[in-house]
Design a protein with these regions (language model features):
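Eukaryotic helix-grip
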Residues: 25-220
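Positively charged n-region of N-terminal signal peptides that target proteins for export
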Residues: 1-6
Length: 220
């Protein structure tokens, strides 16, 4: 999701590639599709796919560590990622390297989607810019009846400090949602998914435990 995810943010945004009435404002082949409340949503075509890639850009009142803590707290994704249903931490490889399972609630008549994601976080020590890669891992968890498994998806975060306790977050997602999706459902996710996800993230990231979070390899 698109999802929006931490890729858990992720697939709550999966249908955003069909955003209607895109404005002709390009940014490295990205086209600005909408802008509300400081949340900018871009799309661009993907080769051999009817689904477009999506990029969301906005400023958040948070430190690097604060936003990283919120993204890594995958089991609370349903509190902020649009239509996120269930998220389970599978494995902690290191404090900045985890694997988790997520299920996205997709309205009838389409079936729910699920996926397994590997989140890896690094920081440039000079610029303090954080990079988060979150590709899907096919075959890591057995598929479930009645749920469509997403096996091809890559989510990326770039987080850069822009002031005291403020960061600029850029999230991109390329995904194959698998199977047919009704047009009305596509439009629902396209108009609401990215905006609702980042609206909620702005609030969610203010939890005290995230403000207090510290990581050995992350500088604010």
């Amino acid at each position: 999701m698109l999802k929006l995810t931490s890729l858990c943010t992720l697939v709550a945004l999966i249908l955003s590639g069909f955003l209607p009435s895109a404005k002709l404002v390009a940014q490295n082949n990205w086209i600005l599709a909408s802008e509300h409340e400081g949340i900018m949503i871009y799309t661009r075509a993907m080769q051999n796919s009817k689904v477009k890639a999506v990029k969301v850009v906005c400023n958040l009142n948070a430190t690097n560590s604060q936003l990283v803590a919120a993204i890594l707290d995958v089991e609370t994704c349903n509190e902020w990622v649009y239509h996120s249903k269930r998220n389970v931490l599978i494995k902690t490889i290191s404090p900045l390297d985890i694997i988790y399972y997520a299920e996205v609630d997709v309205p009838w008549p389409a079936e729910n989607r699920d996926y397994v994601v590997h989140i890896q976080i690094t920081q440039n020590p000079q610029s303090k810019v954080i990079s988060i890669n979150s590709p899907c891992i096919p075959g890591y968890v057995a598929e479930k009846a009645g749920i469509v498994r997403i096996s091809n998806s890559v989510g990326r975060w770039t987080i850069a400090p822009v002031g005291k306790s403020q960061v600029r977050a850029e999230y991109t997602l390329e995904v194959d949602p698998m199977g047919d999706i009704p047009a009305w459902l596509t439009n629902l996710f396209a108009t609401k998914g990215p905006l609702e996800t980042f609206r909620r993230l702005k609030v969610h990231v203010q939890k005290d435990e995230y403000k207090k979070a510290r990581y050995t390899n992350i500088s604010n």
